[in-house]
Swiss-Prot record:
It catalyses: alpha-D-glucose 1-phosphate + ATP + H(+) = ADP-alpha-D-glucose + diphosphate. The gene is glgC. Pathway: Glycan biosynthesis; glycogen biosynthesis. This is Glucose-1-phosphate adenylyltransferase. Homotetramer. It comes from Mannheimia succiniciproducens (strain KCTC 0769BP / MBEL55E). Involved in the biosynthesis of ADP-glucose, a building block required for the elongation reactions to produce glycogen. Catalyzes the reaction between ATP and alpha-D-glucose 1-phosphate (G1P) to produce pyrophosphate and ADP-Glc. GO terms for biological process: glycogen biosynthetic process.
Amino acid sequence: MNNAVLNQPNKYDLVKDTLVLILAGGRGSRLHELTDKRAKPALYFGGNRRIIDFALSNCINSGLNRIGVITQYAAHSLLRHLQTGWSFLPQERGEFVDMLPARQQIDDNTWYRGTADSVYQNLAIIRGHYKPKYVLILAGDHIYKMDYSQMLLDHVSSGAKCTVGCIEVPREEAKEFGVMAVNETLKVKAFVEKPQDPPAMIGKPNSSLASMGIYVFNADYLYEALDRIKTPNTSHDFGKDVMPLALNDGVLYAHPFDRSCKGRNTEGAIYWKDVGTLDSFWQANIDLVSEEPQLDIYDQTWPIRGNPVQAYPSKFFYDEPNCKQVDNSLIAGGCMVKNASISYSVLFDNVSVNAGSSIEQSVILPQVKIGKNCMLRRCIIDRHVQIPDGMQIGVDLELDSKRFRISKNGIVLVTESMLHKLNGKSVASEAHLD
């Protein structure tokens, strides 16, 4: 047998020797009030999932069953979701989804100071308990489908000590990401974090090669790198500190996302979204209602698991002639719609829409009640909101700007506290669990 074949890394051994760490402590400040009470990875998405379900499902589908989720900001709903929806792995076989909340292990006066510090503060557990050969580090707040085992194979085959996932993005958007340049072997030759003037790809003046915030490390090199950047004058961040270090050491390689993207549509397009703003969150949800969306959430070959609410079937009641009904929308379980119009929208579980109301291009989170004769257009309605009879949202943006929050692209966010203030009620009366 060919020696090159004999020396190829074994996928089963690689995933068995790998620990996954999902960074899920971020607040998501650009989502404003939508993440006031929940971490960004715990935010609802696609009718009956949460954002973190994509990273977790990618792990399970890739054969990676040793997972730690690092949490910090507003973690209660995220921890409950992990406990109720992701506790099915058999621990007797060494498989788990463990929760690693911020516990101020190194310094009693500080929480995690950055993405790299969140891993550094858990090194005692990682080294002493998990003892991995490789560590895969993921952001818990992106929407995509990816076979991480392919990235692991590429990492080992290249001889890298650190591999970063990358994707081609429009140059004007690249200032929000780490941007790199690579040679013909995919060795990274330059890396800059969130540049104001992103460098273009060779031969593609309008595109940049952006970091996806996905990293594979040889465990020993990760420990060494984290120890080297723990000085007070660093940002304790993978993009700002660890990537430049690996670049200078000559051990940093790139993994193009199109090598491991799963669930492409009929046109072969790849899909990866950072839903870090109100506009991108709204758009990513609305994208799902098209006939052939770029992201196929119905694909059973690469399923996105979660913890769907056990609800009764949704009910649609129409007894008025010429009443426009429901078209091009996603409707989760437990919804009640009576003589109302819904188009190009996403309704999460247990939403009620009363007679005469119209919903267009909107994202309605769980347990929202919409009164009679309401008009909702291009808006995001947060969980538990009760829209009073006759209210119009998204129709007069000048009026909405005095009551709610309006995004750069004119999407209106409505939360329970905003309506309470509008009605003169005490915001402190809110006591819902997310």
